[in-house]
Curated annotation (Swiss-Prot):
Family membership: Belongs to the CoaE family.
Function as written in the Swiss-Prot or TrEMBL entry: Catalyzes the phosphorylation of the 3'-hydroxyl group of dephosphocoenzyme A to form coenzyme A.
UniProt binding sites for ATP: 12-17
InterPro entries registered for this protein in UniProt: Depp_CoAkinase, P-loop_NTPase
Species whose genome carries this gene: Parasynechococcus marenigrum (strain WH8102)
Source organism phylogeny: Bacteria, Bacillati, Cyanobacteriota, Cyanophyceae, Synechococcales
GO biological process per UniProt: coenzyme A biosynthetic process
Name recorded for this polypeptide: Dephospho-CoA kinase
Length: 198
């Protein structure tokens, strides 16, 4: 049976760093964020729906202003739910297609920030949660994405509380330390119940 690892965590917790480690191990990593970006590529059905729904505030279907869209949806839960209802089915369909293509792989990683929120945990045989401190998340978002503290906090609040995700995870990867600590945590999660290593 294929081992399907759902890799999730809070925003700016370090999922991509863990994903790169697993990719270097030779495991295919399917990236929900990339699939969502692809769904909103110029002139797709989804980008046309977004341009129609939000109007000039987000540009045109040929040239969406993703930063403006982010500011809107992370400050208005109703608008965020509308966008998620549009994008999540497209992302789910892409995952199902990619999983069918990779059916002969022994291990596949599904990197999905909103794994539980989108109901995509049903595609996984196990869940790995990448965790760090809320302070680190805020600092990373402000530095990486150029967000204000308030914008970063809005994005944190748009996701399930990390404790709720932790309760549903099979393995928690603490990414609040250095690179060596992260490698050790990933290795621990990679151990199989039967003792074989990753």
């Amino acid at each position: 049976m294929q081992r399907r690892i759902g890799l999730t965590g809070g925003i700016a917790s370090g999922k991509s760093s863990v994903g790169r480690l697993l990719e270097a191990r030779g495991w295919p990593v399917l990236d929900a964020d990339q699939y969502a970006r692809d769904a909103l590529a110029p002139n797709t059905a989804a980008s046309q729906a977004v341009a129609h729904h939000f109007g000039a505030a987000v540009g045109t279907a040929a040239d969406l202003d993703r930063k403006a869209l982010g500011r809107i949806v992370f400050s208005d839960p109703d608008q965020r739910r509308w966008l998620e209802a549009l994008i999540h089915p497209v992302v789910r369909e892409r995952f199902q297609h990619e999983l069918a293509e990779l059916r002969d792989e022994p291990v596949v990683v599904l990197m999905i920030p909103l794994l539980f929120e989108a109901g995509l945990d049903v595609l996984c045989s196990e869940i790995w949660l990448v965790d760090c401190t809320p302070k680190q998340q805020l600092e990373r978002m402000i530095q990486r994405d150029g967000l204000t503290k308030n914008e970063a906090q809005n994005r944190l609040q748009a996701q399930w509380p990390i404790a709720r995700k932790r309760d549903r995870a099979d393995c928690v990867i603490d990414n609040s330390g250095g690179v060596n600590d992260l490698l050790a945590a990933v290795s621990r999660c990679g151990l199989r119940a039967d003792g074989t290593t990753w």
